[in-house]
Amino acid sequence: MDAGARQIRFTGEKNWMEVTMEEEEKGKRKGCIERQQDIQDLKYPNLPAGHSHHGNKSRRRRRQSGFWRWLRGIRRQRDKPKGDSEKGLGSCVGALAELTLEEAMAEEPADAASPTADDGHLDKWTAWRLPQK
């Protein structure tokens, strides 16, 4: 490639530049970090900017995906009426008030509990514990 040859370079999401080699060498000599865009090459199509899969579409279209879609789902769950499983026992209060344990207590009094299998260990423990209090 001779010094005056041109090359096409991709400089970002939107811009294709046509830069001559001489200008590029001058920029390097000056220590220029950012080159000015000399010629915008219109032969190439507009490449997508921002949201990669939506191209240069409207803002409304972009809101239909990604973070906004996730946020709408969260809000929908929060505002959704709760199902039967998540309701409290408010509807059952009347039936719960009628429940009693009288019949069960008449059949098996609390004093006649089943014999324990502690073999006197509880008595030993209480005898050891009482003086410490």
UniProtKB/Swiss-Prot annotation:
The record places the motif (Nuclear localization signal and RNA-binding (RRE)) at 59-82
Q: Where in the cell is it found?
A: Host nucleus, Host nucleolus; Host cytoplasm
**Cellular component, GO annotation:** host cell cytoplasm; host cell nucleolus
- What is a GO molecular function of this protein? RNA binding
Q: Does the keyword Coiled coil apply?
A: no
Q: Where is this region: Disordered?
A: 42-65, 103-133
| RNA-binding (RRE), as annotated region | 13-27
> What keywords appear on the UniProt entry?
Host cytoplasm, Host nucleus, mRNA transport, RNA-binding, Transport
Ranges spanned by the short sequence motif Nuclear export signal, renumbered to the chain: 89-102
Q: Where is the composition biased (Basic residues)?
A: 51-64
Does the UniProt entry include the keyword Cell inner membrane?
Answer: no
Judging by the UniProt lineage, the source's domain of life is Viruses
Q: Which GO terms describe its biological process?
A: mRNA transport
Q: What remark about domains does the record contain?
A: The RNA-binding motif binds to the RRE present in incompletely spliced viral pre-mRNAs. This region also contains the NLS which mediates nuclear localization. These overlapping functions prevent Rev bound to RRE from undesirable return to the nucleus. When Rev binds the RRE, the NLS becomes masked while the NES remains accessible.
Any idea what job this protein has?
Answer: Escorts unspliced or incompletely spliced viral pre-mRNAs (late transcripts) out of the nucleus of infected cells. These pre-mRNAs carry a recognition sequence called Rev responsive element (RRE) located in the env gene, that is not present in fully spliced viral mRNAs (early transcripts). This function is essential since most viral proteins are translated from unspliced or partially spliced pre-mRNAs which cannot exit the nucleus by the pathway used by fully processed cellular mRNAs.
Question: What assembly does the database describe for this protein?
Answer: Homomultimer; when bound to the RRE. Multimeric assembly is essential for activity.
Q: Give the protein's recorded name.
A: Protein Rev
Organism, by scientific name, is Caprine arthritis encephalitis virus
Protein's gene: rev
